[in-house]
Amino acid sequence: MVMEVTETERWCVVTGGRGFAARHLVEMLVRYQMFHVRIADLAPAIVLNPHEETGILGEAIRSGRVQYVSADLRNKTQVVKGFQGAEVVFHMAAPDSSINNHQLQYSVNVQGTTNVIDACIEVGVKRLIYTSSPSVVFDGVHGTLNADESLPYPPKHNDSYSATKAEGEALILKANGRSGLLTCCIRPSSIFGPGDKLMVPSLVTAARAGKSKFIIGDGSNFYDFTYVENVVHAHVCAERALASGGEVCAKAAGQAYFITNMEPIKFWEFMSQLLEGLGYERPSIKIPASLMMPIAYLVELAYKLLGPYGMKVPVLTPSRVRLLSCNRTFDSSKAKDRLGYSPVVPLQEGIKRTIDSFSHLKAQNQPKTEVTETIQWKKQTLIAIVILITLYHNFVATTGSSSVIITAVSKVLLVSSIFMFINGILPEKMKVFGSKKID
C-alpha cells in the first residue's frame, strides 16, 4: 500500500510510536499541529485505550491527521513503505532495556537503525532524530557525575542494550549530511511520568510484596530523572533546530545531546518520594551492591535457562544492580546552547503529576486478598531466612578442612535465602502455612 500524502500536508513518522515517551511525543505533535503524524509500530493495528479513544489522538485518527502503519524495523521494505511522503522521522523504537538478549538488541538497534537510515535516504526524508540513551557512555563500573558529551563510548558496555544503542547512535551521527539528510541524537536520562509501564508499576508491585524496603548500595548515589514531557520537548527542539537552516542547523546537526530535568536528586530519595506519594513505606534496609551482584548473576543465568519455558524477565540483573548503585548525572548545557532546550516541567511538579496519574495503584486501593498473601509471603520468607542464616553462622564457625564442603553449602543457602527474599521465589506451597506464593 502506498501512503497517500497531499502536497500541502507535512508528515512525520514516529517509530515505536506506541511506546511510553513516543505516545507523549505523538500527542504533542498533534496538539500543536506541527505535523500530520504516522505512527509506526509492530502491532498489526492500533488499539487505543479509553482515554486515547475519546481524546485528541482518537479524534486525530478519525480526521486523518494521524495514521498507523505496522512496520518491523528489521524489514527494510516495510520501513520504506512506512516512511513514504515523510519530511521528518523520530526514531524512538527499541527493545526493553532490561532484556539482555544481544541478538534481539542488535537486530533492532543496529540492523533496524541501518534500515531506518537507508529508508530515509531512499524516500527523501529531510530530518532524522534518534532517541538514544545515556547508557551509551556507561561501562558498568564507573559512575558519571555531570558528564558531558565529550565522554567517549567505553571499550565495554554494561549490557547488550547499551552496546547496541551506542552502535545505532554512531550510525545516525555518521549518516548526517548523506543525500541531504540531517541527523542528531537525544540521550534522555531516566524518563518518568504518566503512562510509564515499567518504573512505577514495578515499584508498586515490589512494595505490595514487601520487597521495596531495600536500598542497593549506600543510598548516596545521585541521578538525573527526566519528566516525559521534557523529553518530548527536547525532540521537538531538535527537529526545529535542524529545520532552522544556517548556523543554528550547522551547530545542531550531527551531534548527540544529554537531556535531563537539570535537577539531580539522590536515586533512592526519588524512589522514596514516589513510594510515599502512593502510600507505601520508604526503603530503609541497605544491602551492599557487592553482595547483590552474585545473586543477580544467578538470576540472569536462571532466566537464560528457563526463559524459553515461561520464566518472566527478572527485575534483578547485574546491569540493574550497577545502575541502582552508581551516580548517573549529566550536563545538558549543550542541548540548551544548540537546541534551545530547557525543561518545561520542574522535577517536583513532574513527580506530583506522576503520583496523581497512578492514583489507582495507591496503597489504600490494594486488594485485601493481596494484602493477606503478602503477609503470608513475608512469614514464609522470614522463616526461611532465619533458618538458613542460623545454619550459615553455625557452619561458618566450624573450622578445619572437614567443614569446607559444609561451609560452601551453607554459603549457597544464605545466598539463596536472600535471593528468595528479594525475588519472592518460594515453593508453590509451604507446609507450615499451606498457601500459594505471590506471582
Swiss-Prot record:
GO molecular function: 3-beta-hydroxysteroid dehydrogenase (NAD+)/C4-decarboxylase activity
Reaction(s) this enzyme catalyzes, per UniProt: a 3beta-hydroxysteroid-4alpha-carboxylate + NAD(+) = a 3-oxosteroid + CO2 + NADH; 4alpha-carboxy-4beta,14alpha-dimethyl-9beta,19-cyclo-5alpha-ergost-24(24(1))-en-3beta-ol + NAD(+) = cycloeucalenone + CO2 + NADH
Phenotype for K165I: Lost activity
Annotated Gene3D superfamilies: NAD(P)-binding Rossmann-like Domain
Site features described as Essential for the 3betaHSD/D activity, chain residue numbers: D41, D72, T131, Y161, K165, R328
Residues with glycosylation annotation: N75, N158, N327
Membrane topology: Multi-pass membrane protein
Role, per record: 3beta-hydroxysteroid-dehydrogenase/decarboxylase involved in sterol synthesis. Catalyzes the formation of 3-oxosteroids from 3beta-hydroxysteroids-4alpha-carboxylate. Involved in the regulation of inflorescence internodes and leaves growth, probably by affecting auxin transporter activity possibly by altering sterol composition in the membranes.
Entry protein name: 3beta-hydroxysteroid-dehydrogenase/decarboxylase isoform 1
Species: Arabidopsis thaliana (Mouse-ear cress)
